[in-house]
């Protein structure tokens, strides 16, 4: 029996439509549109594609989108100065600095320089700490997007044995925190994990984010499991595949995300959600205080 497909494209479009409707309500009430600043340093082709998709999504929902395409020669001090300016800009609710940054610029220093209230990627230590303390504010986009997929498909998670393959700061670690919040018993595996197969075979819910095509053989999947494949890998043939051997896994799993069209669209949709949230929860309040003075 083939698994049911978790269609990230459809759910992402639903999310964007919902945000667009809320933006129209804001405008009708005399409020400003949310604003997102997207900063790209250098000319990494993959980064340019990601940034273009984010800018397009902003325009689709009616956000104010500001683009800052900086040359590869940009210094760390120049980038931090731009972030300072955006932190103090009352029309900007979210600041996104596209990673990776060129050599010589400290990723951590740059991300920590973004004000937590404008950290719509959810990478600032304050926002990660809030998630860890079970009181999340702006949440990392890919993990939150995955949770949204599970919720929209009414897939129950309480009591499941969840396994996350990959322990990156962007996906694996925050994903484990999201799964704990969702009531799962959660295991995180990484490059030092012994007997990975045993962990995967015991997973009721499997999230794989390692960036290696077909890293998890389909035969390892527990029958009926929920499989979330975060990987996006382009083969020499040009075909895009995930981190899980899809053709075999789809015959064993109960639910599975395809690649492409699964998790990827949700990352951008969640960025849009986070920007609206930052606008309404943080900056509307501050603007009202200023008007009341």
UniProtKB/Swiss-Prot annotation:
Keywords: Amino-acid biosynthesis, Histidine biosynthesis, Hydrolase, Methionine biosynthesis, Multifunctional enzyme, NADP, One-carbon metabolism, Oxidoreductase, Purine biosynthesis. GO terms for cellular component: cytosol. Its EC number is 1.5.1.5, 3.5.4.9. GO terms for molecular function: methenyltetrahydrofolate cyclohydrolase activity; methylenetetrahydrofolate dehydrogenase (NADP+) activity. GO terms for biological process: L-histidine biosynthetic process; methionine biosynthetic process; purine nucleotide biosynthetic process; tetrahydrofolate interconversion. PROSITE patterns: THF_DHG_CYH_1, THF_DHG_CYH_2. NADP(+) binds at residues 166-168, 232. It catalyses: (6R)-5,10-methylene-5,6,7,8-tetrahydrofolate + NADP(+) = (6R)-5,10-methenyltetrahydrofolate + NADPH; (6R)-5,10-methenyltetrahydrofolate + H2O = (6R)-10-formyltetrahydrofolate + H(+). Pathway: One-carbon metabolism; tetrahydrofolate interconversion. It comes from the Bacteria. Homodimer. Belongs to the tetrahydrofolate dehydrogenase/cyclohydrolase family. Catalyzes the oxidation of 5,10-methylenetetrahydrofolate to 5,10-methenyltetrahydrofolate and then the hydrolysis of 5,10-methenyltetrahydrofolate to 10-formyltetrahydrofolate. This is Bifunctional protein FolD. It comes from Yersinia enterocolitica serotype O:8 / biotype 1B (strain NCTC 13174 / 8081).
